[in-house]
């Protein structure tokens, strides 16, 4: 569950993202579905970057059997999402236009913040929150653990997760 309103869902052309179940759910939630152009590898550079830094870095490159999906989803929803959104900084580029009108993206020290800090930095950020979600409640989540505490908790959680699912691969 996201604390903010989702207006649009952008996917590549893969059937794992565009199928009857997903389309039906998005229609029911009044969320617009857009997709990438076929065979345009740079359309989803940000998604592919996140896939590498989030999924592959933390779960590895091996095949994950579908039967392990529920326990992996629990790991992501129970602990990892808090780490990712409230404690792990990301770079948000500043766009600079040169004399010729070309836009260049640069990363200044102040451009590094967590996704939650970025949300808070937006003008009228409260307008983007789901009903019943407040900045104060999200602040409590952000402050209940230090960066080191949550990082240690995530590492322990991943260790326990791999101990549950990896024996299935070794047999």
Where on the chain are the PLM-derived regions?
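RNase H-like two-metal-ion nuclease catalytic core shared by retroviral integrases
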Residues: 11-13, 17-26, 33-59
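Short, well-ordered loop/turn and helix-capping segments at boundaries between secondary-structure elements
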Residues: 31-32, 52, 60, 82, ...
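Short, conserved catalytic/metal-binding motifs centered on acidic residues
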Residues: 9-12, 84
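Short, basic/hydrophobic alpha-helical segments
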Residues: 1-7
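Intrinsically disordered or highly flexible coil/loop and linker segments, enriched in small
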Residues: 64, 82, 86-97, 128, ...
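Charged, gly/pro-enriched flexible loop segments at helix/strand junctions
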Residues: 78-119
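C-terminal accessory regions appended to core domains
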Residues: 105-171
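Short, solvent-exposed helix-loop connector elements
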Residues: 57-73, 95-96
């Amino acid at each position: 569950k996201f604390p903010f309103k989702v207006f649009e869902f952008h996917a590549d052309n893969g059937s794992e993202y565009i199928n009857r179940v997903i389309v039906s759910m998005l229609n029911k939630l009044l969320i617009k579905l857009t997709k990438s152009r076929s065979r345009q590898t740079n359309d989803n550079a940000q998604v592919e970057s996140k896939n590498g830094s989030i999924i592959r870095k933390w779960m590895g490159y091996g095949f994950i059997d579908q039967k392990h999906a529920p326990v992996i989803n629990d790991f992501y929803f129970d602990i990892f999402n808090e780490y990712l959104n409230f404690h792990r900084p990301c770079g948000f580029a500043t766009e600079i236009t040169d004399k010729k009108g070309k836009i260049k993206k640069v990363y200044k020290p102040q451009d590094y913040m967590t996704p939650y800090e970025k949300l808070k930095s937006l003008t009228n950020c409260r307008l983007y929150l789901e009903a019943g979600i407040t900045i104060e409640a999200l602040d409590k989540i952000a402050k209940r653990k230090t960066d080191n505490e949550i990082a240690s908790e995530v590492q322990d959680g991943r260790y326990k997760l791999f101990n549950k699912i990896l024996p299935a691969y070794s047999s």
